[in-house]
């Protein structure tokens, strides 16, 4: 709890109204919330060292051969050549000769609860946090030590996040936005509105409220000042960052909020010390978000089914240092979509996105690897009418999509070290966490992945995971997920 609060307080370094009051309130609240009897118990420091590996730090000039990484009490304490680093006596050693060490991977945009079918919503009501935990364990198993959930049920995400932070369950470190501001919940016309006719109005209301928390479509009727009040309330709900819709979801050609309101949302997020990102699906919604001052454009490579992003706008992203989470897919997947699902809503969008991604690479945009992924229920996948394309280099399958996205960036010509940065240091910097995660330097949180093959030689080598270390402790990846609910076939699902 203390570590997460300190992270938020560091991010309140933004110069702006409310800083002294926020700090005074925050310190007082923390003092009242943690009595002396509740202080965390002292535990013996655990020291771990990885030796003999090629250490690939995304911020270093070159890989370090025969390197050593020393970790103590969850933090990196030393990184260097074997003959230059003293390993303390009694340290647990992982011999990584012939292997490669990289920072823990991340996904800038995923959904740990993405299961909007009525069967799952009904059957697991009150237990959504268990599915979030299952998802966070699938991501950790595949090297993602930190993930950023950009749309989901606030209460379930908060419960799972806090359980992982407290050591009550294994899983990737979670940061989340809760609702996409301006969107109604899953059983609405923004998502699966047609399903609402098959359940009670009470269930529809409960389900939608689990996502919305006062930030649904009603905001679009409000004045900027009224929206400001609503956003200020929402920043107190426990979310880690804000995401709003600059364009709509199902009807992707519509602009959601006016320029004035978008600026208000960004201002209030920054006032609370949070980064702010936006959902965009068109050239104009992208440009409006840039002008509003967002930190991250979510799937900003999606600009509609026809028009690519003008280079003028791409250059603006670089000039204003705005990061873009992208949804790259392999050429093989794009071919499968065009062959087996040519009438699919996203098929033409992904073709244009391919061109946008190439333009962003050329211009030097800070690109963040993302997948929009969630747990893919095996029964629903098997019954899919588009299974012929759904199963080719999947994008939205947790634990698989990020590997395919890396291969797609490689196909597009992104440099090998830049691919690594797109999953590590670029994401950390975009979320203003570069002092904690994303690189291998003393003082950083000790999140590492050990690979059996060199990722700089081929993107497929990211799959060759030998070990995952999170918070300075080796993860039992073979045991994950510990209690699968919907990711595997069982008699009751």
Task: List each language-model region with its residue ranges.
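His/Asp/Glu-enriched, well-ordered alpha-helical/loop segment
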Residues: 271, 354-454
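Bacterial N-terminal signal peptides
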Residues: 23-35
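Active-site core of metal-dependent hydrolases
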Residues: 124-125, 244-363, 368-370, 374-378, ...
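Active-site mouth loops of central-metabolism enzymes
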Residues: 119-130, 207-226
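Acidic, glycine-enriched loop/beta-strand segments at the rims
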Residues: 55-68, 81-84, 308, 416-420, ...
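Metal-associated gating/positioning segment near the N- to mid-region
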Residues: 99-166, 184-188, 281, 286-287, ...
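Histidine-rich, glycine-flanked metal-binding segment
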Residues: 61-102
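Divalent metal-dependent hydrolysis catalytic cores, especially in the metallo-beta-lactamase
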Residues: 132-156, 171-180, 238-250, 275, ...
């Amino acid at each position: 709890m203390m570590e997460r609060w300190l992270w938020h307080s560091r991010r309140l370094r933004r110069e702006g109204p409310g800083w002294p009051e926020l700090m005074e309130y925050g310190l007082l609240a923390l003092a009242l919330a943690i009595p002396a009897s509740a202080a965390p118990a002292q535990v013996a420091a655990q020291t771990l060292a990885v030796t003999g590996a090629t250490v690939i730090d995304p911020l270093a000039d070159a890989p370090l051969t025969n390197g050593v990484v020393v970790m103590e009490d969850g933090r990196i304490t030393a990184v260097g050549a074997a003959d230059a680093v003293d390993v303390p006596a009694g340290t647990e050693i992982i011999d990584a000769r012939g292997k490669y060490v990289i920072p823990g991977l991340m996904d800038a945009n995923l959904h740990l609860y993405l299961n909007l079918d009525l069967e799952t919503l009904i059957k697991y009501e009150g237990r959504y946090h268990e599915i979030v935990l299952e998802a966070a364990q699938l991501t950790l198993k595949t090297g993602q030590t930190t993930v950023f959930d950009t749309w989901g049920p606030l209460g379930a995400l908060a419960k799972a996040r806090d359980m992982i932070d407290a050591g009550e369950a294994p899983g990737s470190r979670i940061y989340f936005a809760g609702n996409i501001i301006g969107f109604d919940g899953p059983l609405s016309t923004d998502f699966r509105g047609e399903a609402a006719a098959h359940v009670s109005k009470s269930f529809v209301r409960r389900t939608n409220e689990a996502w919305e928390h006062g930030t649904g479509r009603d905001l679009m009727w409000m004045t900027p000042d009224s929206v400001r009040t609503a956003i200020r309330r929402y920043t107190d709900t426990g979310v880690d960052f804000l995401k709003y819709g600059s364009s709509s979801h199902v009807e992707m050609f519509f602009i959601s909020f006016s320029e004035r309101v978008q600026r208000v949302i960004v201002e209030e997020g920054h006032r609370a010390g949070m980064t702010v990102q936006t959902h965009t699906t068109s050239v104009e919604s992208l440009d409006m978000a840039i002008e509003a001052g967002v930190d991250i454009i979510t799937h900003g490579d999606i600009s509609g089914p026809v028009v690519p992003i003008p280079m003028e706008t791409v250059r603006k992203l670089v000039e204003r240092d705005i990061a873009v989470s992208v949804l790259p897919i392999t050429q093989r997947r794009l071919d499968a979509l065009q062959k087996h699902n040519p009438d699919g809503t996203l098929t033409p969008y992904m073709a244009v996105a391919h061109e946008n991604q190439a333009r962003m690479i050329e211009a030097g945009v800070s690109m963040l690897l993302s997948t929009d992924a969630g747990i893919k229920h095996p029964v629903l996948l098997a019954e899919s009418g588009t299974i012929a394309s759904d199963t080719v280099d999947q994008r939205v399958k947790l634990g698989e999509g990020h590997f395919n996205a890396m291969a797609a960036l490689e196909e597009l010509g992104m440099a090998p070290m830049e691919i690594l940065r797109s999953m590590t240091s670029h994401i950390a910097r975009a979320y203003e966490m570069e002092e904690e995660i994303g690189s291998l330097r003393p003082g950083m949180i000790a999140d590492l992945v050990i690979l059996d093959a060199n990722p700089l030689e081929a993107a497929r080598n990211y799959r060759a995971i030998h070990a995952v270390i999170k918070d300075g402790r080796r993860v039992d990846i073979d045991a994950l997920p510990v209690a699968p609910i919907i990711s595997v076939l069982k008699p009751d699902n």
